[in-house]
């Protein structure tokens, strides 16, 4: 290390070994960090790490790609820094831990941006061109933000889902799952956003409160004789009345095609002034009260007896086109928790309705589907044609009132599906889409996709463990995956479909490979510009190009295929060791990646999943613009330093919500300063130490040095076990405790006298420095994953010839003989020292002494404490930082205690100890004998401290 002594202070006649270091007390992080970012970039530090790690066992943390749109926010910072800490910790643990960042580039948000800037009438080719340019610009902006946070990775060669190689890889992945038999086309209700004009993935749906009119509606008897028989009656007392349903979606009434009852629920035939009403028996009292009616139950029967009975559509008298009947089907999903116990079924607009009607033989062509993709009814729909469904709600209520079939209406606030992009309500809408079948058995295994995925979850490690059940439940209960989207900026489902039959071309798999080869050279634009005749020849007139694009979750969900084993196969590998994202990704990237890998490989693409929580303010509130409680990581980095953000993340239990506020950041900053001060002390007191020249073997060390190194080695083992389990907050807590209590509050405090006052090249001082050298080596490496800037800054002073701390591995501490016994002994000694410190403080408050060195102490001790204290001999006073110390043996703990007296001797000018031999040498009347020996003689001898 460079020897930089403090030359600004006047030289004392009796100098001490007070050294300095270029490592400043003030971090000045906002100024210094960008310099390190620049240096790491210019010196290609990431590439240096890769070269140093070559040949080691790989550790692959596969980056879940953020979307290439907008500035990075605090959630991005949490995610990327957690990944960075893990990758750095694994590199230091001796792995070749590669980090290739990625970006998700296709999809609606970018397409919306292009529409906003250039309108909706751009030709497809221009949309593609501008979308690529926009995504590239956003990626470069985000890249700068991530680098500023100290995240090291292959920033010059990231993966992008819009790279031609990756787009082609997705098409090949699609071909593979088609070849295995997972993909089918069908009419099904899917999440549909009117603003997107497209189907949505489950992960693109969020729930917010919405107020709608609820209605109780009467479907009048169409088969009174059969109804009477079902209730065990010869005839109905009268034919007026019918069955009553309750719904929160009046707009679905025009498309009603069935009624659902639970087979085991008991239904009552109730005589009222509005006629005979069929209601679930459990709901009769509540419903009649709501309708303002009184009634008598005439008969009861289980739902199973009412199956296939028919009732008239409630708008039959309002317009002839509604003169149809709705049959009763049975459904286990019907409950009596609310409503009437009868569910009206519009198969085009409900998954359960659809499944029920299909199970009872309804064909796709029979399904009534009057709502268009923009949310308006088709013009030909009687009474409501051309209206948006939301605008039609009150008109439908009015029409039912006029038809005499409205029993009741009121406004109802409920949690309802919304598009996560547009924040507008969405619906289930039956459309012809391409699906991956969850319960399809492919042609290469007898297990369904659902079964394969669930088995994969069982074989995956989860951090924290609760993530397992969450993902398991989602997979167990999810519907088929809607793969297709109706947009432009996305990877095409590059099929040729027969114009008359709708069938795929018989050479579809071969054609997909042909398209993939073109896309690999020219991007997805190659499909847009492709003339079918190029691939189909004379058959081209019979086929049309499928216009659907792949769900963007298929883009990112297949990165294990087109990145790990595609664009970056030389750096990465399959399966990844770890996927790490926020808890929302159980229904997002974790989910889609599991499904695609289960289809392609029969196993998950990851060995472990790590989930982190979301950021909240100091009061636990979600951050939002309306509350004004958002914190910008860029602003914090420029004001306090990215290191403070990193330390905050590392010190917070990420398995729950991560709370942040100015007060929290203030506490983190104070903690950072304590760590920095510890490093400064270590570096300053090692600035005249050259390991090759000055290091002393363990047998030359004083006992307290051996203890400190054994304690450091124990700490390292403890911390490495936490790193192994991706637990960072215990690492920070233990390092901070070590710095403030074990080092600052004890070892370094005791060491100052030896470092400053013994001869510069004495065995005692060099032994202390050797211990400090090992402690510094260990400490810097242990903190490097989270305090990356600070560790690198200190490292370049500590080991100036080393390229970077990140090519190192964790320090190999020298073995300390009988370390366990030593640790136990010094635990006793430190407890005794705490008692002495307390007694000294009481003496100071009583004005008996000033500093602790003005004191002489007598300790009464018994048993093991007595043995430990007396074993230190004359060095005990150094451990206690007093001028003298003696130990008196007593028989029991009850008799133990500490007596403090003020020393009657003079104070040494140099070491500040009060000693009888101060002035013993006439030529140096202000020196004690110890300092005289250290300066002019052979030096004092120490054994313990």
UniProtKB/Swiss-Prot annotation:
Binds 1 zinc ion per subunit. GO terms for biological process: isoleucyl-tRNA aminoacylation. Catalyzes the attachment of isoleucine to tRNA(Ile). As IleRS can inadvertently accommodate and process structurally similar amino acids such as valine, to avoid such errors it has two additional distinct tRNA(Ile)-dependent editing activities. One activity is designated as 'pretransfer' editing and involves the hydrolysis of activated Val-AMP. The other activity is designated 'posttransfer' editing and involves deacylation of mischarged Val-tRNA(Ile). It catalyses: tRNA(Ile) + L-isoleucine + ATP = L-isoleucyl-tRNA(Ile) + AMP + diphosphate. Monomer. The gene is ileS. It holds the Pfam family tRNA-synt_1. Its cofactor is Zn(2+). This is Isoleucine--tRNA ligase. Zn(2+) binds at residues 908, 911, 928, 931. Belongs to the class-I aminoacyl-tRNA synthetase family. IleS type 1 subfamily. Keywords: Aminoacyl-tRNA synthetase, ATP-binding, Cytoplasm, Ligase, Metal-binding, Nucleotide-binding, Protein biosynthesis, Zinc. IleRS has two distinct active sites: one for aminoacylation and one for editing. The misactivated valine is translocated from the active site to the editing site, which sterically excludes the correctly activated isoleucine. The single editing site contains two valyl binding pockets, one specific for each substrate (Val-AMP or Val-tRNA(Ile)). The keyword GTP-binding does not apply. Its EC number is 6.1.1.5. Signal peptide: none annotated. It comes from Paraburkholderia xenovorans (strain LB400). The keyword Protein biosynthesis applies. L-isoleucyl-5'-AMP binds at residue 581.
